């Protein structure tokens, strides 16, 4: 894990990324939308996400691959991961898009558990995906590497589920991180702003 540091251009990982991008680019026409391009739609729930319920769901659906302490599972080479760590010193940073509850919930619904969920047939409900994302991203119980404080110099460009202030509205940092999101989206639209998530 490089934790936000650029990969060396000639590294095995960078060459793998480039090979994959070249390969996948061969399946789509340029400047044309394609199935799976956008995140799976997810219905916002009318309550704050529950980290407590997310912990129970994490134990049911996620522990076997990502570990009880979010440590992930290393490959045999002890350098890379089969299943990535979700928090701790090797986890993703606060500035990562996966550290945003809405973004992670969309991804979880479409992809997890990896051996049973598909984009067409999700396993998790919308509420379950939101609660697991809230638990995994709960900074009160999970540490992250290299905390950042000024990721977005312009608050209007910040995603509404990014929990670090300042924000372009009067909602609390907790509301931005854990919802409910419908009132925030409504407020932004009423002000003529485009909410990002």
Pin down the residues of each PLM region.
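A short glycine-/small-residue-rich loop at the edge of a beta-strand within enzyme catalytic domains
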Residues: 45, 49, 56, 77, ...
């Amino acid at each position: 894990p490089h934790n936000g540091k650029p990969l060396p251009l000639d590294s095995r990982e960078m060459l793998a990324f480039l090979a994959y991008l070249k390969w996948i680019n061969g399946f789509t026409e340029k400047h044309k939308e394609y199935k799976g391009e956008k995140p799976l739609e997810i219905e916002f729930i009318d309550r704050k996400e529950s980290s407590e319920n997310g912990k129970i769901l994490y134990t049911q659906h996620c522990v076997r691959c990502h570990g009880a302490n979010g440590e992930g599972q290393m490959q045999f080479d002890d350098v890379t991961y089969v299943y990535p760590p979700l928090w701790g010193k090797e986890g993703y940073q606060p500035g990562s898009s996966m550290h945003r509850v809405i973004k992670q919930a969309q991804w979880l619904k479409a992809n997890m558990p990896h051996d049973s969920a598909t984009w067409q047939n999700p396993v998790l409900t919308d509420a379950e995906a939101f609660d697991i994302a809230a638990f995994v991203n709960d900074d009160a119980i999970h540490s992250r590497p290299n905390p950042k404080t000024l990721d977005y110099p312009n608050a209007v460009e910040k995603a509404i589920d990014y929990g670090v202030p300042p924000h372009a509205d009067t909602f609390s940092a907790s509301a931005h991180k854990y919802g409910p999101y419908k009132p925030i989206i409504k407020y932004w639209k009423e002000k003529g702003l485009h909410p990002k998530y």
